[in-house]
Amino acid sequence: MLKKEGKLSDEELINLLEKGQSSVKLLSSTIEIFRNFYKSAENVSEFEVQTSIKNLITLMHTELSRANVSVKFSGFNEQKVRQIENIIQQILLILIHNAKDSLVESYKDEPLKRIIEIKFRSFEDKCYIGVYDNGNGVSEQMSEKIFTWLNTTKKQGNGIGLYFAKKLAQEKLNGDVRLVNNAKPTVFELSFDINLKD
């Protein structure tokens, strides 16, 4: 209608259509996350944490390799847990993906500095997995609302990844996701019960 009335140039129309297409992709992504959240298998099983995380990194190998991001592990042992493995992997996928994006943005011309460190520790009846990156970090202002619906630090982000990561941890694992340190390094930590009650 606006094009017919001469109110939009070809360039403006193309820009408007591209924005509309981006909005559709964002909506589709949001729907997919909702679908996965509510349809995730919730089978409690015994597994080794280190093996589970290394399997996840193997699945992410192509994505991380293309971004020239390397991953280091520390503190891991043969700790076994009775938990919902795929939920833990979903949460870590979000945290690692965010760390990767931060490193790519922070070190555009210095790929050798793109390192993610995943640290493990256990205390009493809980496990803690920290995802560390040395990117630009999270501002103090954003730190206060980082887990709020539709808040994002990324240009192309949808602001729902960390929201769902925290929600999954709290509702499915009797755990939590916290921003432990907001810069140099940025540290997000997942905690969950070693022995989840059915």
PLM regions with names:
Residues 138-149:
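Short conserved segment of the HATPase_c
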